[in-house]
């Protein structure tokens, strides 16, 4: 554990940020998996789930959790999966 007051505060803030980031990434992965299951089963709500997945991916990109190319690649793969 750090002894310096500012270092202790940095530990607290970094733990909070890590929890926020973990939550965002988990939500993104969950929505992607839900869409993939719906797409493979030709479910009727696949378009809704695709929009949700796009939203989660864009949010993760805007928060700096994933890079722009990574987000684009994920979205492209999901769109390709829907078209098949």
From Swiss-Prot:
Q: Which residues cross the membrane?
A: none
Q: Does the keyword RNA-binding apply?
A: yes
Name a biological process GO annotation.
translation
Stretches for region Disordered = 1-25
Looking at the Swiss-Prot or TrEMBL record, what is one Pfam family this protein matches? Ribosomal_S20p
Family under the similarity heading: Belongs to the bacterial ribosomal protein bS20 family.
- Protein name as annotated: Small ribosomal subunit protein bS20
The scientific name of the source species is Pediococcus pentosaceus (strain ATCC 25745 / CCUG 21536 / LMG 10740 / 183-1w)
Originating gene: rpsT
